[in-house]
Amino acid sequence: MRITDFKTDEPLTIYNFSDTHIGAVCFAEKKLKEHIEMCREEGAYWTHNGDWLEGITPDDRRYMVPDDDKDKTLSTLAQIDHALELFEPLKGKGLASLSGNHEMVLARKIGDVGKRIARRLDTPYLGELGYLNLKVMGQNIPILLWHGAWGGELRGAKANRQHRQSHKFRAKIYLTGHWHTWDPYQDSQHYIKRNKIYKYKRYYISLPSYYDTYANGGNYAQSRAYYDGPIGCCKLTLTDKSIKYELME
């Protein structure tokens, strides 16, 4: 398990991207470009929770593209190049990057694509699960980034799957991708220190995607009737006293 850290004496803004699925015929490229530009203009930092690429090409069993969209399918190498081109304006501002299950499938054929992308963007690479240990204006904010795994169809099932991570890994913020949803919630633990009771608040954020599931005539996600979540990312604003998050659509 990998760890990376970052320290600042100023308020910190982070755009949390996930599941961009670059190369998919239903990839919401225009919206991603808008958010990348917003991140650049604000001088903000960013993370990526994996599934950078679609990576589903005609030789993959999941390839289900309507005939009139087949000419839009990029090769895997072209998808990598396009991802690097899109995120070039944010090079050097990434705090952490993961691989998702789509990159892991590609790894069997062409190696660790997620690591390759992260290195080209001068961003720490954490695999599929890792810690980003922040210190913002004196406040310690450990973040657990996990790409995610199948957690069931309903929101409660996904929340339970995410919450289990808190029994294994202590953090203030749990960022999870894979589900293409936006269902943030909070809880807290109480502990004793110097005979006083303190509260440790925790934030659980399932990240949205840039995969517009029902935008075209057919794809693998449609065939499984997957949840159609919001298109966008999370924006974290961190100070010495507060943790705020918002959905960017």
What are these regions (language model features)?
Residues 247-249:
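Secondary-structure transition/turn motif
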Residues 18-24, 136, 147-150, 208:
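Short, flexible loop/turn elements at secondary-structure junctions
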Residues 140-144, 149-241, 245:
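Conserved beta-sheet core of the metallophosphoesterase superfamily
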Residues 107-157:
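An acidic, phosphate/nucleotide-engaging active-site surface
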Residues 2, 11-13, 133, 235-237, ...:
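Ser/Thr- (and often Asn-) enriched beta-sheet segments in non-cytosolic proteins
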Residues 4-15, 131-144, 199-202:
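Beta-strand-turn-beta hairpins that frame and shape the catalytic cleft
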Residues 2-17, 22-127:
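Core catalytic region of metal-dependent phosphoesterases/phosphodiesterases
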Residues 44-50, 77-81, 126-131, 172-181, ...:
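Short C-terminal domain-edge/linker segments immediately following a structured domain
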